[in-house]
């Protein structure tokens, strides 16, 4: 069955839907950010990954390509936290700060992973600062 001209114009071109644009915009923001920052042994990169359900944080030394410490909302003690996802993000921030201190890390470079500094990302960063990490 042939499509009329009106039906063709209503189709959204491939790659132009909202979710694809949002994903590509996030990737562009993260790429721009990664051009400017890198983690060292003295000041590793605090990488944050956010999914719709969980939050992951890692301390990465980019000079040798190793993860120094990690924390995630998948861990049992974080899952046990009552409250919303922001409260769990705060707990992940506290955990990563404690693990960084145990590894001898005082200062970090914050890599928000292309996400807006808002909500869970901001809660994690604030909790890490309160835990003693310097950004």
UniProtKB/Swiss-Prot annotation:
Q: Which organism is it from?
A: Nocardia farcinica (strain IFM 10152)
InterPro entries associated with the record: Ribosomal_uL18_bac-type (IPR004389), Ribosomal_uL18_bac/euk (IPR005484)
Q: Transmembrane region positions?
A: none
Member of which family?
Answer: Belongs to the universal ribosomal protein uL18 family.
Its job: This is one of the proteins that bind and probably mediate the attachment of the 5S RNA into the large ribosomal subunit, where it forms part of the central protuberance.
Query: Carries keyword Methyltransferase?
Result: no
Q: What name does the UniProt record give this protein?
A: Large ribosomal subunit protein uL18
UniProt xrefs under SUPFAM superfamilies: Translational machinery components (SSF53137)
């Amino acid at each position: 069955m042939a499509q009329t001209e009106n039906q063709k114009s209503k189709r959204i071109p491939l790659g132009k839907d909202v979710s694809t644009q949002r994903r590509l915009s996030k990737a562009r923001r993260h790429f721009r950010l990664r051009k400017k920052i890198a983690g060292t042994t003295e000041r590793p990169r605090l990488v944050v990954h956010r999914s719709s359900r969980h939050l992951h944080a890692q301390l990465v030394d980019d000079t040798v390509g190793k993860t120094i410490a990690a924390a995630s909302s998948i861990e049992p003690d974080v899952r046990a936290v009552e409250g919303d996802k922001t409260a769990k993000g705060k707990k992940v921030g506290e955990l990563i700060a404690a693990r960084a201190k145990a590894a001898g890390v005082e200062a970090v470079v914050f890599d928000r992973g292309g996400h807006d500094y808002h909500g869970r990302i901001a809660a994690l960063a604030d909790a890490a600062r309160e835990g003693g990490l310097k950004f």
